[in-house]
Amino acid sequence: MVRIRKRGELFLEKEDKLKVIEKIEKIIDPTLKEFGLELVDVEYLQDGGYWYVRIYIEYLDKEISLGDCAKVSSAVGDDIDKIIDKKFFLEISSPGIERPLKKPEDFIRFQGSKIKVSLKHKLNDKKNFEGVLTKFENNIVFLQTEDEMQIPFKEIRKSNLVYDFKDI
């Protein structure tokens, strides 16, 4: 679901973007909870000269529909307009089959799944790993690659599920 929001254009530093994302998360969370939805991720970025707010949502027990996305867009759009003082596109969608893993709860929920992990700092001369998430305990991600790795949650820059398209 894409919705064009109208405001003036400005350039933002990374820290300012993070503050905007935090404000968006805080302001939309009650509405999402009211609809029985979980917030997966919020992106605030510029692409091709246009600004975008992308909100990824899901139900824990069923799939998201286009109608769900439209309902959320209508419910939160005006609140987000109060935070962002520029023209932007508001996009609401499911996170997709290769959804990001952002919170400790995500790592618990998707134990047994194949994931990709990018680290903030090198571990064994590498920053990127792919393997099976065997468990999450005490803020440590246990990842089965050739060996079992233990990765502190705070060292993860980015992580997402990996869908094996060979299973289609």
Where do the PLM segments sit?
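Short Lys/Arg-rich amphipathic alpha-helical segments
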Residues: 1-168
